[in-house]
Every structure is written in C-alpha cells, then in structure tokens.
Amino acid sequence: PQSPPPPHPRDLTNRIRRQRDWCLRESAIGENRGIVLGVPFIEFLAPGLISMQIIQQSFAHSSSSILSGKMMGNIVDLVGSPLSALEVTLAVIFASITRSIMISFLSILVFSIFIDIRLENALFFVVFLFLSSFSMGAMGFIAGMWSDKWENMATVTNFIIVPMSFLSGTFYSINRLPEILQKISLINPFFHMIDGLRFSFIGSSDGSIKFGLIYLFLFSLIVWFISFFLYKKGYKIRN
C-alpha cells in the first residue's frame, strides 16, 4: 500500500475558507440567534471553530507523520537513530504544536476581516493552545502507532476525534443541555480545550477555567506517557 500525497498548502486554505463561510452564514442570521455567554452568537462561534481546527490539525499532523513512516518503511531510520523515545515523541508533538499555532493565527486573521473578534486574555490563549495541541499531538502519535493502514486512521478520526470535537460545545453552550449531559461534557477533555480557548477570546466560559487547566495538564501528561511507552517498547514498529 502507498501513503497518500503530502498535505498541500491548498488544503489549509480550504479549511480556513470553510470556517470563513460558516461565520458569514451565521452572521447573516446572527440577530436571530441571540446572546450566548454574554456575546452575540457569531462571536461565540468563531473561537469554537478555531479551537476545533487546532484540535483536528494537531492530531492529524502527528498521526499522519507516524503512519506515513510505518507504511513507507522509513520509520526504521527513526527507530535506528540515536534519538531517545523522549526526544522522538516530543519532536513529533512539538511539530504538531507548530502546525496548530500557524492554523490558529491564520484563522484569527481571516475571521477578523469579517467579524469583530478580540483576544481578551493572551496568556490563557497561549496556555490552552499549548495544552490542547500537546495533548492532541500525543493522541495522534498513539493513533499512528496503533494504525496499520489509512483506513484504521480514518476510523479513529471519523468516529472519535471529529464527533468529540463537535459535541464539546463548539456550536453551543453546554448550559442548554440536560444536566446529565452537562456532567458528561465536563469529563470530556475536548470540552475543556474548546472552553478554555473560547474564554481567552470572549472572557466567559461554560466550565471552570482553573479545573480545565489542571484537567488538561494531567491529561497531556497521561497521553504523552502512553505515546512514550508505546514508542519505547517498539509497538507495531519493531517488525
């Protein structure tokens, strides 16, 4: 089997364009959508779309990097290099973070042309951007190690990553959900990624920002340790 062609810059442009079109459509009916968390719905929506791209892009980068190496056979060069498991896992994850940073700033730039989007707290933005990208990069690393072919990766993306990012408050406030679903949302790491990043833009949130920071920090450590352990043991790559 052959790996797909490398990502083309046009792919990133298309993703940004889709987000822009989303915002334009919602702007057209924005007056009818009311106020969410103290801001117009369109200003509530934009940070959610940016957050969703950060989540999906950081996961896609690390997962495709590992799986491409496995399928093309050049991962043996990485395994046989003098780099430690710590160095390899962090290198792949930080590459995912770099991609997420580029996507986030491009998205903010495009959205600022069409809507009033402001960054209320730059420190929280940087912290949540880092934690979200780091944890999703580590999850992508794990998925890449586990997958044997692109169909396996598509299954993870389509049935886990995309649904969890959509069902984590991207398009709505969880206060509108039944109480049991609100409690379920609070244990979903994707919710805290989106909620924290949205807080940095609009200054209000659905959940506790302090709890979200601690939760994502611990979650990042856990998924990084799993990725480190799998690579160190040579899971599905030693053969």
Predicted features and spans:
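Single conserved hydrophobic/aromatic residue that forms the stacking wall/gate
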Residues: 1-26
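Hydrophobic alpha-helical transmembrane segments of multi-pass membrane transport proteins
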Residues: 40-111, 140, 159, 165
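Hydrophobic alpha-helical interface/terminus motif in multipass membrane transporters
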Residues: 25, 29, 66, 75-78, ...
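Transmembrane helix-boundary elements of multi-pass transport/secretion proteins
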Residues: 18, 25-69, 117-125, 155, ...
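Short amphipathic alpha-helical coupling elements at transmembrane boundaries
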Residues: 68, 73-80, 148, 158, ...
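Membrane-interfacial helix-loop-helix junctions in multi-pass membrane proteins
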Residues: 115, 165-222
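Hydrophobic transmembrane alpha-helices
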Residues: 48-56, 130, 146, 156-167, ...
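Alpha-helical transmembrane segments and their short interhelical loops
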Residues: 85-157, 204-228
